[in-house]
């Protein structure tokens, strides 16, 4: 029995390696990660490794845990995402492991393991996973871990031992210092568990859980604060992470439409099927109440902000509840065939894998880097302006010369002024610009290019497919004489234009 239990996590670890390799652009299969957010994180990690102070010398508004993680990844490789790739494998494994444990709370069927693999496959191949290296991806195993112990308490009145509660607190602390909006999940869970404990006269047990969870949060917080105290940048941390996110960041919508409508409609339907049935099957009222509390409050939190579609990746934490459909199912050959077909269909509609195989994966950043690297000199500094981080800093092995090295959804006149001064000063040899069709804040941060710069690279390429943009556009596309599968494989396209300007001698 012990041997079987040992082989199971090894199998899940190998499967996590497989799906991460196939679907994350951080893996060695892909030449680069084209996502601007991921490149921002890695650029900041490189800058911190080179001695720059976070939020003071280089700026973004996410939490410090994210950048410290990328600093550690940069220790392994400064111009690739191999360090993040290894972290992603661990996260995928932990997510599937605790999803499996959650399923086994409600079923002893042998279907739980293959179903767990299917959920892991669907999660990483979904549009919500995007390119990989998102805050939501790294938070998903933490939510799955916490949800398992909360469901176990709600279903069986079984309280976690002290070290399990401590680890839940450490996970909560990591989320606190990565993206505090996700704490809505915990708020809903804690309030629901408090009510359940009160009804069953288990307030003492709940008190012990809260005590050790709090200790875990403190344990995760101490090294974070110690880092900023040592660097004398606590005030910058508070201002950049809390004040900016609460009062300034609103997530600029694209093309004048709410970002929610980017959410792929088909995957939304699949996600609903996987999670919502809990409310329509026979289960203890405590379990339903807990799911409603965590699920509902987290979903409600999205209504308070401009939502990027990949935020909804967090909802896959609830996907193990699909076991309610199969809790008495005995898997047969047809079961495995069905699972395989679903996996193949999901992979066949995965943008990352499809474009890698058909040769249309965006590679213009590598071409730009090759041009810049071929003409390197002592003053060949690189500056991106009026655009996101394209990854040019990693591939040219440069660091940004300025603090605000990319445009963000914060329309800040000080950031605009700093970027404009750097562009017009003529201090850098190369100016790199990305003009994206999906971003509306380019014009705000635009700056005139000095006359002594000339364009040496100009290329437009496919950046991303969008299954839908707005409801009326989605319905309009369906009126065309094409079958649904053709629509899936030939959706709305988004192009980006990449330019490099070189200063004349």
Describe each PLM feature range.
Residues 163-182, 186-191, 219, 295-303:
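Membrane-interface alpha helices of multi-pass inner-membrane proteins
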Residues 86-107, 145, 149:
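Transmembrane-helix motifs of polytopic, lipid-linked glycan transferases
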Residues 144-167, 201, 271-286, 327:
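Membrane-interface transmembrane helices that cradle and orient dolichyl/undecaprenyl
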Residues 357-442:
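Short periplasmic/luminal acceptor-recognition loop of GT-C membrane glycosyltransferases, typified by
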Residues 99-123, 140-141, 157-159, 163:
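Transmembrane-helix signature of polytopic, membrane-embedded enzymes
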Residues 97, 266-298, 319-322, 326:
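Hydrophobic, aromatic-rich transmembrane alpha-helices
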Residues 184, 300-334:
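Hydrophobic/aromatic-rich transmembrane helices and adjacent perimembrane loops
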